Amino acid sequence: MATIGYIRVSTIDQNIDLQRNALTSANCDRIFEDRISGKIANRPGLKRALKYVNKGDTLVVWKLDRLGRSVKNLVALISELHERGAHFHSLTDSIDTSSAMGRFFFHVMSALAEMERELIVERTLAGLAAARAQGRLGGRPRAINKHEQEQISRLLEKGHPRQQLAIIFGIGVSTLYRYFPASRIKKRMN
């Protein structure tokens, strides 16, 4: 049962001594480090630390925000450790998932992360509904407006080639096929 430390500083200029001293005092057998922003998901030091952790081991950080910036990421990382039979310990936040209280705190964090996701979905849906009520549509603007659609439809019915119409209207041939499938034009011509 090893104790693995993880250090992260956001910039090369930041000093890691405070974190290293704390992890050394916590009797970490091995310490991994990153000098990279917590917003960056791809952290080589953290990846090596997680590979090194085995069942019964504990991953130790000086402070919770050294491991991740969002509750969602923290929950995912700690869940991964839990699934592998490993523990997590944050020294300054007094979180230790090897204890009942630490596991309870982790479950509260998980619930908060889920609630945060649900609130984001609710706000997004409410915003889209409000925009629709004001006549705004979401998504990319249409490539061609109604008037242009009517013009193109008439020209296609007269037999003008799609490639030529695409150049004239400044759109792709695939856009023309999306608006005017070949089967629809043939039906109109018959």
From Swiss-Prot:
It comes from the Bacteria. Gene3D superfamilies: Homeodomain-like (1.10.10.60), Resolvase, N-terminal catalytic domain (3.40.50.1390). The keyword Transport does not apply. One of its GO terms (biological process) is DNA recombination. SUPFAM superfamilies: Homeodomain-like, Resolvase-like. Residues 162-181 bind DNA. Residues 2-135 form the Resolvase/invertase-type recombinase catalytic domain. Pfam families: HTH_7 (PF02796), Resolvase (PF00239). InterPro entries: Homeodomain-like_sf (IPR009057), Recombinase_CS (IPR006118), Resolv_N (IPR006119), Resolvase-like_N_sf (IPR036162), Resolvase_HTH_dom (IPR006120), SSR_resolvase (IPR050639). Belongs to the site-specific recombinase resolvase family. A DNA fragment of approximately 900 base pairs, adjacent to the fljB (H2) gene, which specifies the synthesis of phase-2 flagellin, can exist in either orientation with respect to fljB. The orientation of the inversion region controls expression of fljB. The hin gene occupies about two-thirds of the inversion region; it is required for the inversion of the fljB controlling region. PANTHER family: DNA-INVERTASE FROM LAMBDOID PROPHAGE, SERINE RECOMBINASE PINE-RELATED. This is DNA-invertase hin. It comes from Salmonella typhimurium (strain LT2 / SGSC1412 / ATCC 700720).
